[in-house]
């Protein structure tokens, strides 16, 4: 049996950490492999043993290219991990003045008010670190959502 047949039969294989091939490709910064796996139909919402999805890894490693692909393919933006954190939490925490991934997640409906196991939200964290631009991105998203739900 050749390598291609093995990959096609086991595309959703997960390792000892519960990570699938897509998650490992993201961690390894192998975008071409990640794109190929998505195109082959890998589970884009697979959760590892810590509850991380491929989108969590994109947020952790600030990989906007694959995050955008996953969101366009319908990845669930608000899945929480074992700590109650959605991918937006990691994007906010790792932004370092680069707000592109945060804006992308917000555009696709990430919940900036989602409380984790410590009862803190991404917006709470932005306020704690006094990141005015981040606060504006997250707060404006929630104001728009509240306005639209009242229509």
Question: Model-derived features: where do they sit?
Answer:
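Conserved ankyrin/ankyrin-like repeat signature
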Residues: 32-33, 65-66, 100-101, 133-134
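Ankyrin repeat domain, specifically the short helix-to-loop turn at the C-terminus of the second helix
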Residues: 5-9, 35-43, 68-76, 103-111, ...
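Ankyrin repeat A-helix N-terminal signature
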Residues: 24-29, 57-63, 90-98, 125-130
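Ankyrin repeat boundary signal
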Residues: 13-14, 44-47, 79-80, 112-115, ...
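Intrinsically disordered, low-complexity regulatory segments in ankyrin-centric signaling systems
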Residues: 1-28, 35, 39, 144-151
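Alpha-helical adaptor scaffolds
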Residues: 27, 49-52, 56-61, 65-76, ...
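Ankyrin-repeat-protein effector appendages
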Residues: 2-5, 9, 108, 117-120, ...
